[in-house]
Amino acid sequence: MKAEEWLERAKKDLDDAKFNLEGGRFEVSAFLAHQAAEKALKALYVLKFGRLWKIHDLVQLAKQVGAPHEVVDVCDKLNPHYIATRYLVETVYTAERSREALELADKVIEWVEKQLQK
């Protein structure tokens, strides 16, 4: 897949995350927010390296594509949602927690979009 296709899928995942937040499916919403950020970063990775890196660690992806410290910090906050939403851990998902994940993912997508326009 091309970088643009990865970014388009990232945006769709973010839209789906918003839909699930509105429907009260907070865990699904936070998971999709993580997926949106991951796919956005993979768009940039594919553009830079010409191949896909099969990894779910947003911090590692962000560092590999040369993200600034602020974006790496955002990724660090999003990273736990990959595991916590899929396994029965003690994390309680609320509308506020899911909304925060959406906002963080949106920041990653915005940064990636700017990089792709350069």
Residue ranges and their predicted role:
Residues M1-K118:
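Terminal alpha-helical segments
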